[in-house]
């Protein structure tokens, strides 16, 4: 779990690093139009949720297309989705996980200090800095889900090809003299008596410590793309050999026998998996955030233009006024280039799929 947090933080810093100064107003079309804003004695050239960009900072840094794009994207997200109680709650959990990780290490950890400093640079200050960004992340998830749901039949085809499943895991660490309750025979009896899911929850501490599951033993979404996973203590990803077996299973099925896997540090585990769900629509609407998030990611990853389509869709519903002509030009150019690249990737993917189908037919 901690490694997942570290990876997310790395992405968080990358994204935040690209959020810079830009002269742009974005607000809902049905709201009043704002011509100018001030905060104290400074002119505000952008007001996006709680983030304010001041005019005297506008030209401190070189106008960069990546910077402009991420500012544009952040603005569209924040103005397109209201901050619901559910989003606040989910963002708070994300914030607490990040804070907990660093405070377990060192409250003065240089990475944590760097994160707070970077957040401050972009206007996210005080105790709520990380939470404000987390809210933006959760808003984007909600917008993606709405769009995918509306266009589900068209988008699901590429996801179906990956045979997605939601699974539970039980890991037993190999020991010379394991306690009775940690033996394969004992756990087999529990599975037969109480069912796989209840037993997985009882032994979830092992998989949770490996960063693989929640405290109920739920790993969540997996598909063919994870068949090549390496198993390391730092990867927080299910071993590829387990995924390969899961891909051959149906809903309600579990491993008949225990599978032995060894991580990169030489630790060996006995593993069993259970397929809880194969219905993609149900996974998209799961009560578990991890299942939903990974399902959404699969839709985005397997439909190359989807990210651009979603952004364009919500941006079209907003009133966008650029105070800086160069900014408008750079953003427009960036968006066109991004869509062009996405279409090229989609064409290449389709060609590869056709070639594979031809090979299999022959």
What is the role of each PLM region?
Residues 1-69, 317, 321-362:
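Short, low-structural-confidence N-terminal segments
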Residues 31-132:
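N-terminal targeting/tethering segments
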Residues 39, 138-170, 178-185:
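Acidic/polar surface patches and capping/hinge elements
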Residues 40-43, 48, 163-169, 266, ...:
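Extracytoplasmic
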Residues 60-75, 85-93, 109, 128-138, ...:
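Soluble non-cytosolic domains of exported or imported proteins
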Residues 70, 74-79, 92, 96, ...:
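Solvent-exposed, polar/charged alpha-helical surfaces in well-ordered, non-transmembrane soluble domains
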Residues 186-244:
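Peptidyl-prolyl cis-trans isomerase
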Residues 259-262, 269-293:
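C-terminal soluble interaction/assembly domains
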């Amino acid at each position: 779990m901690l490694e997942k947090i570290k990876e997310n933080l790395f992405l968080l810093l990358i994204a935040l690093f690209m959020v810079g100064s830009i002269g742009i107003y974005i607000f809902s079309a049905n709201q009043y139009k704002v011509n100018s804003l001030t905060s104290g004695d400074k002119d505000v050239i952008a007001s996006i949720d709680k983030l304010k960009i001041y005019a005297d900072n506008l030209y401190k840094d070189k106008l960069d297309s990546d910077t402009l794009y991420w500012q544009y994207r952040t603005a569209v997200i924040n103005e397109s989705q209201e901050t619901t109680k559910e989003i606040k709650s989910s963002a708070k959990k994300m914030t607490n996980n990040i804070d907990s990780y660093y405070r377990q290490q060192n409250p003065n950890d240089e990475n944590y200090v760097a994160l707070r400093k970077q957040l401050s640079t972009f206007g996210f200050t005080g105790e709520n800095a990380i939470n404000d960004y987390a809210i933006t992340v959760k808003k984007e998830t909600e917008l993606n889900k709405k769009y995918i749901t509306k266009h589900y039949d068209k988008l699901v085809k590429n996801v179906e090809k990956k045979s997605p499943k939601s699974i539970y895991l039980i890991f037993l660490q190999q020991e010379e003299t394991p306690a009775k309750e940690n033996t394969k025979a004992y756990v087999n009896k529990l599975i037969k008596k109480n069912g796989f899911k209840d037993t997985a929850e009882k032994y979830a501490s092992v998989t949770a410590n490996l960063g693989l599951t929640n405290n109920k033993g739920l790993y969540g979404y997996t598909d063919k793309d994870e068949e090549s996973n390496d198993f390391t203590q730092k990867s927080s990803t299910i071993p590829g050999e387990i995924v390969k077996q899961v891909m051959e299973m149906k809903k309600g099925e579990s491993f008949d026998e225990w599978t032995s896997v060894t991580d990169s540090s030489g630790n060996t585990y006995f593993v069993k998996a259970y397929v809880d769900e194969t219905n993609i629509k149900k996974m998209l609407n799961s009560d578990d955030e991890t299942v939903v998030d990974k399902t959404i990611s699969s839709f985005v990853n397997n439909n190359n233009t989807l990210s651009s389509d979603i952004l364009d869709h919500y941006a079209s519903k907003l009133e966008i006024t650029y105070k800086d002509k160069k900014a408008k030009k750079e953003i427009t150019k960036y968006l066109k280039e991004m869509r062009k690249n996405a279409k090229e990737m989609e064409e290449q993917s389709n060609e590869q799929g056709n070639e594979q189908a031809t090979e299999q037919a022959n």
